[in-house]
Amino acid sequence: MVKVGITGPVGSIKAEALAKIMEMLANEGKIIEGFLVSEKVEHNKLISYSVMDILSKKKAEFARQDIVSRVKIDKLGVDTRLLEDIVIPSLERAKSEADVIIIDELGKIENTTKNIKNIIEDVLKLDKTIIVTLHKKSRNPVLQEFRSLESVRVFDITPINKNILPFKILKVINGEEESI
């Protein structure tokens, strides 16, 4: 099974491409599970991050400025319990039920807790189609490990290719284009 990474600039084009890919996979009857991360920005300032279980739609705002925590993402305090309460059940269920597993913002999420890191590492070893979004410049060990896995294709999304990339990725997932 192919593992796809989508990298790109900060902003919404990764999320838009991922949403399009998920829509096309759902139209093919694929069971898609995992989690999505969204950010809330006001006046060009990052306010918070939320995480959502794709299947149950359960959502939590897990990172904000006013959360006091040793764990931080982009200077925001992280409520690790809220994050674990969504990410871990979502990925546990996906391991057995999903055709395609989504891990959004791999570089930001996996180092928040040992439990999250462990389940993400387990999921990445599965023989399933996995789509992750990655921060473009991250030197994170988990990202390096992801890039070194077998049958991984990493696509860099840009404003120029953002409309065609979802179709190209779908072809790779469906085995219509060589993945190595």
From Swiss-Prot:
One of its GO terms (molecular function) is ATP binding. The keyword Acyltransferase does not apply. It is an enzyme of class 3 (hydrolase). Its EC number is 3.6.1.15. It holds the Pfam family NTPase_1. ATP binds at residues 8-15, 100-107. Keywords: ATP-binding, Hydrolase, Nucleotide-binding. It catalyses: a ribonucleoside 5'-triphosphate + H2O = a ribonucleoside 5'-diphosphate + phosphate + H(+). It comes from the Archaea. Belongs to the THEP1 NTPase family. Has nucleotide phosphatase activity towards ATP, GTP, CTP, TTP and UTP. May hydrolyze nucleoside diphosphates with lower efficiency. This is Nucleoside-triphosphatase THEP1. It comes from Picrophilus torridus (strain ATCC 700027 / DSM 9790 / JCM 10055 / NBRC 100828 / KAW 2/3).
